[in-house]
Amino acid sequence: MEKITLFHGTSSRIVVPTYGLGEKKHDYGKGFYLTDNLNLAKEWAVCKPDDENGWVHQYKLDTDRLKILDFQEKDVLSWLAELMKHRDASDSRRYRVLSKKFIEKYGIDTEGYDVIKGWRANASYFYIAKEFVRDNIDMDILTELLSLGGLGIQYCIKSRLAYEHLQEVQDGLLSVDYMEFREKYNHRDVSARQKMRELIDSDANKVTNVFSTLL
């Protein structure tokens, strides 16, 4: 039996993880999202610009008998295809047509998995995604771009079994100061975007092996 410690950053003091709930338009669809990085959880707890302190809930996940899909072990295009299933990087007709083809070619069937593990698509990701679908980013620099984003790794609890294996640590609730961690969240995003723009504008970006050529 292997138990891992995970954290859920939120503006809510009371959280009840419930099977079947969650937003369809989150990165991996409906589910309960956590991270194994406490500092990132604190930043995510205050990512909404409402000047309210946040909360971090601590959990233990018993991974015994759980089927986990880890996108870090897959091609980055498979991860992008999964995000395209749930989130729109553009509202253009071109994107709607090409993203469907992209998902068909690179997407993974996630049905049957109890937990999905992978990068979190924050604001920096959407900057990359928009440039990628516009054919402004070469595939050769895509992985490096994503690493510059400091996206962080998240776990999405999907199945009823996974929810049953998730237990909150009763004395693990932490209060998060809005001003301190909102500043860190903003700094991370600004720094990431600056580094991304520099790489996209560099000679390393050949703009040859681009989104539309991968279909």
Predicted regions and their residues:
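Short aromatic-glycine-(Arg/Gly/Cys) micro-motifs in beta-strand/loop hairpins
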Residues: M1-K25
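Extended catalytic/binding region for NAD+/ADP-ribose chemistry, centered on the ART fold
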Residues: E23-K48
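Conserved NAD+-utilizing ADP-ribose enzyme module
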Residues: E2, H26, C47-D50, D62-L215
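A short beta-strand micro-motif
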Residues: L6-G9, W55-Y59
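Short N-terminal amphipathic alpha-helices
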Residues: K42-A45, E52-Q58
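Short, surface-exposed beta-edge/turn micro-motifs
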Residues: E2-I4, Y28-G31, G54
